[in-house]
Amino acid sequence: MSLINMAKREINCKIVYYGIGLCGKTTNLHYLHQAVNPKDVGDMVSIDTETERTLYFDLLPLELGKVHGFQIRFQLYTVPGQVLYQQTRISVLKGADCVIFVADSQASKLQENIESWNELQEQLRRMNKDINDFPLVMQWNKRDLQDILPVSVLEQYLNLYHVPSFESVAVTGKGVIECLRVGINSTLRRLERI
């Protein structure tokens, strides 16, 4: 849920990148940190394990200027994708205004993607979020690799709500900014309705 500070005229929103381990969530944030104007982005904070997998979260603060006289700030988080970090994912997901679900497009990762997607849906339900009204974006990552599933298959198994979806190659930035832009715009539209 967005934090609104009336005294400072600030709105802080939270976007969470969610998906299986090594699907490209942290790579998205690294690309954005390099691509965004330095005056609009803060320092990236990562808590990694020795294998460079995210242990708790990555955080990237992003300022977008003013809307209706309020300074808009987005905090971009990733969750650890490894199965044993479910409680951490739940903690990071709390208060999210938008989720970008990053799916690994490799055929060998379909079942893991489905399990992660099902877990996300369950957690959103437990948080009383209506998936039909909640800002959600699907990102089909690693489109540059061999043995990837057609987008139509990913859509069939993972995009049952027909939310916006993007093909991406996070290591090169393909689709990363477009995906975030839709997440931000969806979040701002929802804020205007509240």
Regions found by a protein language model. Give the residues of each.
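Inter-motif core of Ras-like GTPase G domains
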Residues: 86-107
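Conserved C-terminal guanine-recognition region of P-loop GTPase G domains, centered on the G4
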Residues: 105-161
